[in-house]
A protein has these predicted regions:
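Betabetaalpha-Me/HNH-type nuclease active-site subdomain
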Residues: 109-256
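Short, mixed-charge aromatic SLiMs
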Residues: 83-98, 172-173, 248-258
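A cross-family structural signal marking well-folded subdomains
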Residues: 1-154
Length: 258
């Protein structure tokens, strides 16, 4: 398609085409460089917030749309990026399929009303209100870290100067409160299913399955400024929270965001 398009152009048209490519490349370089050099993420920075979400959801499909908005519609970028951000997070949280995102982006590049189109896409490829319960019990580390990082950004919104540390996602470590190797120190801790019902230890298969699901759930994660020592990470709840003072090994309280 590219060769066919180029072959139909006159020399002046080719120069104009090359200039467009150059201009888009400059915009791309600028916004990617700003994002990669960002040392403190704040909620009001809508551009880098969207790039953070795209990056950590491993979604590059919408890069052409982001580039087009920045190049052609900078004055409406905040609204358009919010619409896309809302769409992406809804699809992610409610476990919507991403297999047609190529077609979605292609259409998004062409339609005059992005908000209306994204709403239409949601109706044609719906999610259910119950699916988030499943999604939040099977998060990988990158996904869980993103969710907690966005929550931290939102909690600091407008009060960033009150905090001693800066927010850069790569400097944070994700900690499982109940460790992945829970068998050693957590066997005597009661286990409850998603409905709050006690799971009996006599039903070993159900007990183990419930624990394995809970380990990967969003409520079992903490965002820390430093990785815990392995002797703390796999310890019981009290030790994980407070650490071991005698050996100067900190727990979750010491390394949680200040």
């Amino acid at each position: 398609a590219y060769k066919k398009e180029v072959n139909t152009k006159t020399k002046p048209e080719l120069y104009s085409f090359l200039k467009d490519i150059h201009d888009y490349a400059c915009v791309y370089y600028q916004y990617k460089t700003e994002y990669e050099n960002q040392s403190d993420f704040v909620w009001s920075d809508y551009k880098n917030r969207l790039l953070l979400i795209l990056d950590n959801l491993d979604t590059t499909t919408f890069n052409p749309y982001v580039l087009k908005v920045l190049k052609e519609s900078p004055n409406s970028a905040e609204e358009k990026f919010f619409n896309l951000e809302k769409f992406l997070l809804q699809r992610f949280i409610f476990d919507g399929t991403t297999k047609n995102y190529n077609q979605c982006c292609e259409k998004l590049l062409a339609v005059p009303n992005d908000k209306a189109y994204l709403s239409e896409y949601m109706e044609e490829s719906p999610t259910t209100n119950e699916s988030y319960k499943v999604k939040f019990r099977k998060l990988n580390n990158s996904q869980a870290r993103l969710i907690l990082f966005l929550v931290e950004m939102l909690l600091r919104k407008g009060d960033e100067s009150k905090f001693n540390d800066t927010l850069k996602i790569d400097k944070f470590s994700l900690e499982h409160i109940m460790p992945q190797k829970w068998q050693a120190a957590w066997m005597t801790v009661s286990s409850y299913d998603e409905n709050g019902k006690l799971v009996p230890t006599s039903n070993i298969e159900l007990f183990n399955r419930n624990r394995e699901e809970a380990v990967k759930s969003i409520g079992n994660f903490a965002l820390l400024s430093s990785k815990l020592n392995s002797s703390i990470s796999n310890a019981n709840f009290e030790t994980k929270i407070n650490g071991k003072v005698a050996s100067n090994k900190g727990g979750i309280k010491k390394y949680s965001s200040s």
